[in-house]
């Protein structure tokens, strides 16, 4: 095979792979939602920096409880649900919600 033909074949192959990847892109997002979101956790975070808190119970997507804090600067951090400080933060937020 002559070099220009090989380059053309490689370019076509790359284009086909990109099109196939782009077409399957939606499925990849769904697959990533079906697994644990927290790979590492923090044992503590300053309560004043938390904007919102999401607690996801164990389920088919993940066998462990996940606590995800959205901080006031927009960052999301995973907290260790077993840590006493995290449990107190969750209780404070739950009690605050009951008071309203």
UniProtKB/Swiss-Prot annotation:
GO cellular component: extracellular space
Listed CDD domains: Chemokine_CXC (cd00273)
Tissue specificity statement from the Swiss-Prot or TrEMBL entry: At least expressed in the lung and trachea.
Gene3D superfamilies to which the protein is assigned, alphabetical: 2.40.50.40
Compartment list: Secreted
Superkingdom of the organism of origin: Eukaryota
GO molecular function, one term: chemokine activity
Cross-referenced InterPro entries: Chemokine_b/g/d, Chemokine_CXC, Chemokine_CXC_CS, Chemokine_IL8-like_dom, CXC_Chemokine_domain, Interleukin_8-like_sf
Disulfide bond sites: 36-62, 38-78
Induction comment from the UniProt entry of this chain: By lipopolysaccharide (LPS) and inflammation; in lung.
Record carries keyword Transit peptide: no
Listed Pfam families: IL8 (PF00048)
GO biological process: one example: response to molecule of bacterial origin
Keywords: Chemotaxis, Cytokine, Disulfide bond, Inflammatory response, Secreted, Signal
Described purpose of this protein according to its UniProt entry: Chemotactic for human polymorphonuclear leukocytes but does not induce chemokinesis or an oxidative burst. Contributes to neutrophil activation during inflammation.
PANTHER family reported in the protein's UniProt record: C-X-C MOTIF CHEMOKINE 2 (PTHR12015:SF194), SMALL INDUCIBLE CYTOKINE A (PTHR12015)
Family: Belongs to the intercrine alpha (chemokine CxC) family.
Assembly information from the UniProt record: Homotetramer.
Protein name: C-X-C motif chemokine 2
Record organism: Rattus norvegicus
Gene for this chain: Cxcl2
């Amino acid at each position: 095979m002559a070099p220009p033909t090989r380059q053309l074949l490689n370019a076509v192959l790359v284009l086909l792979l990109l099109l196939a990847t782009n077409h399957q892109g939606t499925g990849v997002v769904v697959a990533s939602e079906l697994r644990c979101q927290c790979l590492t956790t923090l044992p503590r975070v300053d309560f004043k920096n938390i904007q919102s808190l999401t607690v996801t119970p164990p389920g088919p997507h993940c066998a462990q409880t996940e606590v995800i804090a959205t901080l006031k600067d927009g960052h999301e951090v995973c907290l260790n649900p077993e840590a006493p400080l995290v449990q107190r933060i969750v209780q404070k937020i739950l009690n605050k919600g009951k008071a309203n």
